[in-house]
């Protein structure tokens, strides 16, 4: 039997960093579904494709996802796809039902025959519906804005600038929870964690301990 851990949550909730660390401590594979949408966005951008063309050529594209890396035509694009322009395009793509359907099939294939920790916005509800452990990792928008600013190395010199970031996060939440294709929602059997007052390490330790208990590791 293979073990699956699904971690969902809104943007900047820390789910990718937590999921990656949990996977390493358990010796599991790790995959962030956000990387797949970013890879789609990157391919669209460099080849000047629209969504319809992307859907037509998707099976002909030479890319692979392995060991937390993303490769396109054998080139590592893991860092390139982190830029804000790609992120915005990926966010728009993720609202397209056909793109999501295509992505989910690939994500499910990646999770076969391996122990895995996967994070995203529809893992516990769509991608890995039968995962033995599911989490919904959340935090207050203001806390998530602070964490994103730290991750990006941005020091806000005014409250107005910071509030704009908070507003951006709230807007992203609204988009994610209201889209027609696989909206962001907590799975009924997911464990809810509000990390607003928890450290990164506390969240990781909680998940690792529960996984070792449930999976008898």
Swiss-Prot record:
<keyword id="KW-0418">Kinase</keyword>
<dbReference type="GO" id="GO:0036430">
    <property type="term" value="F:CMP kinase activity"/>
</dbReference>
<comment type="similarity">
    <text>Belongs to the cytidylate kinase family. Type 1 subfamily.</text>
</comment>
<dbReference type="GO" id="GO:0015949">
    <property type="term" value="P:nucleobase-containing small molecule interconversion"/>
</dbReference>
<dbReference type="GO" id="GO:0006220">
    <property type="term" value="P:pyrimidine nucleotide metabolic process"/>
</dbReference>
<keyword id="KW-0547">Nucleotide-binding</keyword>
<dbReference type="GO" id="GO:0036431">
    <property type="term" value="F:dCMP kinase activity"/>
</dbReference>
<keyword id="KW-0067">ATP-binding</keyword>
<dbReference type="GO" id="GO:0005829">
    <property type="term" value="C:cytosol"/>
</dbReference>
<dbReference type="GO" id="GO:0005524">
    <property type="term" value="F:ATP binding"/>
</dbReference>
<dbReference type="InterPro" id="IPR003136">
    <property type="entry name" value="Cytidylate_kin"/>
</dbReference>
<feature type="binding site">
    <location>
        <begin position="9"/>
        <end position="17"/>
    </location>
    <ligand>
        <name>ATP</name>
    </ligand>
</feature>
<keyword id="KW-0808">Transferase</keyword>
<dbReference type="InterPro" id="IPR027417">
    <property type="entry name" value="P-loop_NTPase"/>
</dbReference>
<dbReference type="Pfam" id="PF02224">
    <property type="entry name" value="Cytidylate_kin"/>
</dbReference>
<dbReference type="InterPro" id="IPR011994">
    <property type="entry name" value="Cytidylate_kinase_dom"/>
</dbReference>
<keyword id="KW-0963">Cytoplasm</keyword>
<protein>
    <recommendedName>
        <fullName>Cytidylate kinase</fullName>
        <ecNumber>2.7.4.25</ecNumber>
    </recommendedName>
</protein>
